[in-house]
């Protein structure tokens, strides 16, 4: 299992130390919120540029914004590995996904908990990652919604049919109590914020999620 600690849960007063404490992660998950699509504001490109100078861990950028094309171009110079947009918020998602791909970045598509998985069927060939929200977006520290496990199974079947190389990622309320179920549901990447950043040993917490089979053996 690949693990992406969510910087939304980090202490920004000590950002360098926080990032070093999760340096064994597979990705750093960055939530970009504009205060319009979701009722919260987070980091911009200046903060994220500092992050790239502190860490070699690839960036996984999740855009929760009204104008995804603008923000994709704004963050592209920082060379994130992934930029994901919300299916619910784009009139022309293919166009935005192609823009992200043309910028040399893996495009991803995001589904909120209430959005039907069939809505992304015709987008799957255009993305390298599907991100399923297992909480309602906008704030960290929320409880995992169990209904998303069934959705994972359905999305994984769509991925197998339309784009087998596409990764399945889940974000929200992920911890050591539900990681095995997520693995069984076909999830490839988990985003975890509060669980990791509240752990006494963050690197050990990450390893526990990464090595889910061994930790449960």
From Swiss-Prot:
Binding residue positions for a divalent metal cation: 29, 31, 62, 171
Determine the domain of life of the protein's source. Bacteria
**What keywords is this UniProt entry annotated with?**
Carbohydrate metabolism, Isomerase, Metal-binding
Q: Does the keyword Metal-binding apply?
A: yes
The record's InterPro entries line, in alphabetical order, gives:
Aldolase_TIM, Ribul_P_3_epim, Ribul_P_3_epim-like, RibuloseP-bd_barrel
A GO term, aspect molecular function:
metal ion binding
Q: Does the keyword Transmembrane helix apply?
A: no
Query: What is the protein name stated in its UniProt record?
Result: Ribulose-phosphate 3-epimerase
